[in-house]
Amino acid sequence: MTTPLTWHDVLADEKQQPYFLNTLKTVAEERQSGITIYPPQKDVFNAFRFTELGDVKVVILGQDPYHGPGQAHGLAFSVRPGVAIPPSLLNMYKELEATIPGFTRPTHGYLESWARQGVLLLNTVLTVRAGQAHSHASLGWETFTDKVIALINEHCEGVVFLLWGSHAQKKGAIIDRQRHCVLKAPHPSPLSAHRGFFGCNHFVQTNQWLVDRGETPIDWMPVLPAESE
């Protein structure tokens, strides 16, 4: 069941909180001082732009944005067209290939088509300094994304939360399992994928859950915008 509420409706007050204004101010000051911050300012809130609150069917929690040039564009795990597919996403594609009939591994890592179908690709920290993983982890983003998760938990029904790795699982501890579907596995990173991400069957289980609820399943084959027109 969807909610008529929008992100603006439920986050307007949060965005006026002193901690949040301070987060934005710190990021803006770092950019102005010449520090390269990813993703570009216009892309920081893309996860919310591409997936409205009332359209959320699935939440995939990431952690930090990618910190290499041209990679991050505001959607967790996704990279811009033309950028090499990162190892964790490649492992996600391998799991899809092994479990979703007809899935063929794409040559790009751009996941906007997932987001447009209701997959909220949410990093728990929304900015990072170039080349410095977790450099913005203590700026206040975690407080904001905790609030986002709590709002989805409260206002939406029957959302599938894919929690990969201990960080995502801690963030998702508040989710009401009576109202939502929570699936846990190790992170798809090469460091942990062989400990149970491969074979977790989460993409299949997600679609089965949606179909059982009378909803349209996700087409997990990522399509570039030009291909879908």
From Swiss-Prot:
Keyword Nucleus: no
A GO molecular-function annotation: uracil DNA N-glycosylase activity
SUPFAM superfamilies linked to this entry: Uracil-DNA glycosylase-like
UniProt-listed Pfam families: UDG (PF03167)
Coiled-coil spans in chain: none
Catalytic activity: Hydrolyzes single-stranded DNA or mismatched double-stranded DNA and polynucleotides, releasing free uracil
Example of a GO biological process term: base-excision repair, AP site formation via deaminated base removal
Main location: cytoplasm
Keyword tags: Cytoplasm, DNA damage, DNA repair, Hydrolase
Function of the protein: Excises uracil residues from the DNA which can arise as a result of misincorporation of dUMP residues by DNA polymerase or due to deamination of cytosine.
Family (UniProt): Belongs to the uracil-DNA glycosylase (UDG) superfamily. UNG family.
Protein name: Uracil-DNA glycosylase
Record organism: Klebsiella pneumoniae subsp. pneumoniae (strain ATCC 700721 / MGH 78578)
Organism placement in taxonomy: Bacteria, Pseudomonadati, Pseudomonadota, Gammaproteobacteria, Enterobacterales
